[in-house]
Amino acid sequence: MTNVLSISGISKHYGKIHAVNDLSLEVQPGQVFGILGPNGSGKTTTLSIVLELVRADSGTFQWFGEHPGKESRKRIGSVIESPNFFPYLTAALNLKIVADIKEMDYDDIDRVLKVTGLYERRNTRFRTFSFGMKQRLAIASALLGNPEVLILDEPTNGLDPQGIAHIREIILQVASQGTTIIIASHLLDEVQKVCSHVAVLNKGTKLFDGKVSEVLSVSDCFELGASDPVALEKWLHTHTDIESVEKKNGIFQAFFKARITPADINNGCFRDGITLTHLSERKRSLEQHFLELLEEKNDQTP
């Protein structure tokens, strides 16, 4: 299967700042690929490079197995900056201008307005739109022509919970039709909800990339309590399959390196004379994994 996007060893420096540092990624057809990281991690610079808005200092990238060019650009829709349309024109008229720029006919305008939930407001002037509606109109403009790839840079930034939910619904709907979506975001919860794959960046360096499901399945977390907490704590710290242990309000959180069941834990404690009073399983969130990756990176920095 040919990758939709292949990035190989891309770097971009602004003076002494390493915006992107030797980055390599692969995005395959149909993936919802999240590029996750704090502000200044290189997300927007990476997207700007692959959209040919910024030139990399080194490295290469390909779209659809070929070097980038006019034909590949026609297959990509993107929203990189804040929505910017003519304020006194309606949503439909603004999209007609975008269609003219893209050399497309107007047949697709009603479809993208319906996808983004703006069809009933198609004859409303842009200046009266809320910020969330403006963001949705920007996505509608990117969807004109039904591109194979949709690129969104911080699509929910600055939105209220309702606006975030609207954008999430649009992303999931577009993805369900087979469109490959690449999203840059610092909102871990939203990435976890919509993305199938994720790459974690920090200060221009990739810390991780892979399936979101794999991230969430690593190191099962269990909450444990016992009638003898001292004995339980000793047991947890001597267990070779436990990665880390935290204690809060008399309850221990244990992260296991390998897959383990509650029955395994209960039996192990019982054999060693420990009676558990509390045992529950908690899946590791993307946020936990993200923070651990950043902590590991900081520990490695001289």
Which residues are covered by each model-predicted region?
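Short loop/helix-cap segments at secondary-structure boundaries that form the rim of catalytic
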Residues: 71, 216, 235-236
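Conserved beta-strand-loop-alpha-helix hinge in the C-terminal portion
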Residues: 205-227
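Active-site phosphate/pyrophosphate- and oxyanion-stabilizing loops and adjacent acidic/basic residues
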Residues: 96, 213, 234
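ABC-family P-loop ATPase nucleotide-binding domain
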Residues: 1-11, 296-302
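Conserved NTP-handling cores and scaffolds of large molecular machines
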Residues: 102, 240, 297-298
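ABC transporter nucleotide-binding domains
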Residues: 4-5, 12-183, 188-202, 208
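Short low-complexity, flexible loop/linker segments enriched in glycine and/or proline
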Residues: 199, 292-295
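Short, charged/small-residue-rich alpha-helical element at the C-terminal edge
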Residues: 221-293
